């Protein structure tokens, strides 16, 4: 009985030492710019990578109003960023201020 208790205690310690159940791996998400507008914004979690892809013929940016990112996107280019923390982040294009969107980043 004592040996079983030690084994269970060791397993419990190992479980908590590695952080419990595995957290979800960071995902790669894409936001496409086309026809002078940002495409659909996917569900995001802190740690995810966003690929901003400009399929338009015009130069754009994806610029956070809180200054957490500013992605320069010449025509037919793409750039990656990693979202660091949960919360809402409003963004826009510096060249075309009517182009706007919001990232809703979950923990």
Residue ranges and their predicted role:
Residues 2-4, 8, 15-107:
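Extracytoplasmic copper-binding redox domains, predominantly the cupredoxin/blue-copper superfamily
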